[in-house]
Structures are given as structure tokens and as C-alpha cells.
Regions:
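Sec-dependent N-terminal signal peptides
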Residues: 4-14
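Carbohydrate-interacting regions of secretory-pathway proteins
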Residues: 19-222
């Protein structure tokens, strides 16, 4: 009995995560049943254009329906976000991260991993880009109407990676000299708070088109 207890203690101690090591604990942001982990940007509840069908979050652009960006209740600093998205027809959306609720839209503070019906290596506003700043290096998007698997990773040190369908699309360091040079050469140059929020919300953008999301989960990397 003592021997078994000792072995168990050694196992537990040697498998404890250390500071800075990523956790294996995933928080399920969407369980296929409800939007309890979300609300609207600067609103208490999601717009009623955001619906759930067949365990999928769907933004439906129908007359009389109110959309707006769908935003996480929680705030995140260093994390790995995994999800799948689909454009049922050509359109535009995005995953905006480290969002602060200030004057103006979510993208005034948060960088965006672009969702679009077009993807070409080098396209700064194409799918997978950090919108208008860092283009995807490869094209890995599936056909319109098919699902795409995304991993958005922000590591300590503000090192960001965009992955889609098992391909690394781009990587960069927020706040670096290269980052700042690109921001200063973009439409964001006069947006004082852009990319400066250290811990913020994640938004699924309503850009006026239908977009679907599923299998949304996140884990801390600090």
C-alpha cells in the first residue's frame, strides 16, 4: 500500500505543469447547444441573427434579424484557439482577438485572422492573413461550403501563429519592430489602441455575410 502511494505521488509530481508550460485543459466555448459563453460586442446578449442549427453556430442574414459581432464572455491573453469555420457561399468574416470594448468597432483594437472566399499566398486581405498586415504564405482553404480547421496561437512574448488545415500560414510578434512598421504603413496607423490590448475578448465578425462556426475550444498557454 505504501509502495503504491509512493509511486502515485512520484507520478503526480513529475506530471505537474510548470510555469510557462501549456495546460492540457481545454475550455469548450461552444458545446453545440447554446451560446452561454458568448454575447454581442458591447451588448449583454448575442444578436438574434446568430443561431444554432445541427450543433453549428450560424450567422443568418435575414430581414428583421440583428447580428453584430459575436464575442466571448471571457478575456484571453496567451492561448490556443481551435475551431472550424465554413462560408456557405462567398463572403467575408474574421476572428478578431484581444478585443477591448472601446469607442468604435471591435477591429479598432483587435487584430483579425481573416475569413474570406479567396486565398492566395501573399494576399494581405485573403483568408488566413492577419488582416492587412501579414499575408498567408501558403493557400490551404477548402472549397466554399466545406469546413476549414483553424488554430490561432498566441504564446508568451506575444508570438502569434495562424494555422489552417494543418498548414502554418503566417507568424509574427505583436509589438515588435516589424509589427510596428507594418502597422504604421497601414490603415491602422492612427488607431492608438490597435493591437495594444494585452488581455481581451475574441470576436466572430459580422461582415454582412453568412458564416458558420463549430467545435470552438480554447486553452491557456501561460
Amino acid at each position: 500500500m505504501i509502495k503504491s502511494f509512493t509511486l502515485l505521488s512520484i507520478f503526480l509530481l513529475t506530471n505537474l505543469p510548470t510555469y510557462g508550460e501549456e495546460s492540457n485543459h481545454w475550455d469548450i466555448l461552444f458545446d453545440g447547444k447554446n451560446l452561454n459563453n458568448f454575447r454581442g460586442y458591447k451588448k449583454e446578449k448575442p444578436g438574434n441573427a446568430w443561431t444554432i442549427e445541427d450543433k453549428v453556430i450560424k450567422l443568418k442574414k435575414e430581414k428583421g434579424k440583428v447580428g453584430g459581432d459575436l464575442m466571448t464572455q471571457g478575456k484571453y491573453r496567451f492561448f490556443e484557439l481551435q475551431l472550424e469555420w465554413c462560408l456557405p457561399k462567398p463572403g467575408n468574416s474574421g476572428i478578431i482577438f484581444r478585443v477591448g470594448e472601446t469607442d468604435g468597432p471591435a477591429y479598432k483594437t483587435g487584430p483579425e485572422m481573416q475569413i474570406f472566399h479567396k486565398m492566395n499566398p501573399g494576399g494581405k486581405t485573403d483568408t488566413g492573413s492577419c488582416y492587412a498586415l501579414y499575408p498567408p504564405k501558403v493557400a490551404s482553404m477548402n472549397k466554399i461550403g466545406e469546413w476549414n480547421k483553424v488554430r490561432l496561437v498566441i504564446k508568451p512574448g506575444n508570438k502569434v501563429e495562424h494555422h489552417m488545415n494543418e498548414k502554418l500560414l503566417c507568424s509574427y510578434t505583436m509589438g515588435s519592430k516589424d509589427w510596428q512598421n507594418r502597422v504604421n504603413s497601414s490603415k491602422f496607423k492612427n488607431w492608438e489602441l490597435f493591437g495594444t490590448v494585452e488581455k481581451g475578448h475574441i470576436c466572430f465578425q459580422d461582415h454582412g455575410n453568412e458564416v458558420w462556426f463549430r467545435k470552438v475550444r480554447i486553452k491557456s498557454l501561460q
